[in-house]
Amino acid sequence: RTSAATLARVLATMYSNPKFQGAIQGLPVGGVSGTLIHRFVKTAPQAVGLVQAKTGSINGVVSLAGFVDSGDRKYAFAIITDRLRHTYKIESAARATIDKLLGKIAAPMQIVTATDVAPSPSPEASAN
């Protein structure tokens, strides 16, 4: 058995090692590609394109592990639900809950422009 915390630490370590960049870049993107193409679209649309992760499931377990962008940061995460009753409805609800949780964290990077940093002085202000 592996804990979610251990899995998240492994992902964070991989992220900081250039040898693993190909594996990280190959992760499916929420609402965009792979096994996550239909995830987040209805459950947490604000997270579409901001979650890169791998799904996992066996009877009674639903999991998602990867990275979520939040502003100018990227967080490694691992969420593992366990001991679920093995029904489509319950496992779908677990996936939706995971999506909504990540939707609370996900945020696009804010682009700062020169006008956001310092407004131009008005001609009247520079004349005084």
Positions of the model-derived regions?
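Small-residue-rich helix-loop
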Residues: R1-N128
